[in-house]
Amino acid sequence: MRYILLIISLLAISLPSLAQNNDPKIKRIEIVYGGEFTIDNAKYPGATIFKSDGNKVQFRHQGLDIWCNLAVLYEEKNLVIAHGDIFVQQGDTLQMNSQYISYNGNLKTAVAKENVVLKNETMTLETEELFLDRNTQEAYYNNFGKITDVENELTSKTGKYFITKKKNQFTNSVKIVNKDFVVDSQILDYYHPTGNAYFYGATTITGQDYKVYCERGFYDTRKEEGYFMKNATIDYDLKTLKGDSLYFDKKKQFASGTNNIVVIDTINNTIVKGHYGEIHKAKDSMFITKKPVIISLIEKDSMYMHGKKILVTGKEQNRTIRVFPDARIFKSDMQAKCDSIHSNEFSGLTQLIGKPVVWTGESQMTGDSIHLIANTKTEQLDSLKVFNNALVVEKDTLSDGYNQVKGKVLYGKFKKNQLKQIDFLQNTESIYYVYNDKKEMVGINKLTCSHIKLHLDEQQQVEKVVFITQPVGDLYPEDKLHKNDRKFREFIWRGDERITNKDEIFSEEEKKQQPIKIQGPKEPEEVDIEEAKLNAEQDEETSTETEK
């Protein structure tokens, strides 16, 4: 008799509520299994209380099932509040466990609390409070959550899960922990089927032998492969790579950069710049192009080397640098040009190959090939050698003539990175303009000697010429020496090619070059939208053609 009265009471509650809410779009929460049920209007006015009788209480609403130990159903509000050992299932898209859930059938929203665990076939989400919106198929938390999938453990203070897309959107103190790396980020999107992460704020990736920083980027956590932008930096292979756009592939041991790239090598005190560069760790090599320049710190001065391409190979302390073609050097007290530069750090030898020219002070130096030798211990310039057709030319300050010394071989000696002495050996000759104390021209001296030594002052100008062996020659009055005889056969004045500052190492054509336009990494839905737009445009064109 007591149970009959209870059923009558339930009908009395439910019938008015149905009359009040007759919106056909709103579906009622169904009682699949009620177990034991009671009414306590003092504690739960207008509600029915359902309790497990050994089998769990079960409710259903538009494809969502809720099992629990205890539930309070407000039929008028289309609201159920469940307690104790709760299990929720929505088709094959998600399963959820908790100790508390409040589900609103009118809004199709839920709040789950206490040891909340949400699962699907690709991931598990754990938190203490989770909000579920079935209209948008989204679940989100605001007070720390942990997500695990096949490869990674992800945590954040706040986060959202898009059930249909199988995508997480994390904000605030985001961390991805993998056995091979750790990601710390402000904001990121993560796709569980692929393991791809997209960054939208300050992000650091720390791997076993690399570290990445960016503020916009993409990372495949399964392949350790990524694309990074906005203040992007990669620390890899004892180098720091910066640029507008960076790419990294751990498996291939490869990193590259595009636009305004900078490679800092602290071991060798060098900086390399350009608009495209590659680092191949397995090959111990680095390749830079598109306005490349390598900057070496020499005491308090910097030396700039530029060519169309720069290739650096070899391990530290045994690197080889190749600069080609149209190679150029700028240093405050020395400049050079040639077809290519070949420099070896182990030997300290730098070779200038192909029509080389070196300027120091007011002097121009040419020959078939020029070698610069550095002291590998002090890393200072030590000496200079010019092989075959060595020629030093200095424009005369009081006339339109040129002072010249030539020989088969030239040896130069540096002191504190400044060229101080030049020795000419074998078949040496000189042409010098001679003046008296009143700076009046006395004549032009043409001499031949087996060994000539030049001493240079602080301004790198010739201050003294010494003939080591007895010279042979004459002093000619200016009007007695034909202009063609005032220059050696090898003479070419290349002063108009001289590089006067570090910006002039680039050709006029290179100065006009602009960085390429870079597009950021696109998420799958962005690609889908673009493809949909493209398909729509193609359909429209097809339709127009059909009408014609």
Listing of model-derived features with the role each one plays in the protein:
Residues 5-14:
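Bacterial N-terminal signal peptides
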Residues 15-19:
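Sec/Tat signal peptide C-region and signal peptidase I cleavage site
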Residues 20-548:
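N-terminal amphipathic/hydrophobic interface segments
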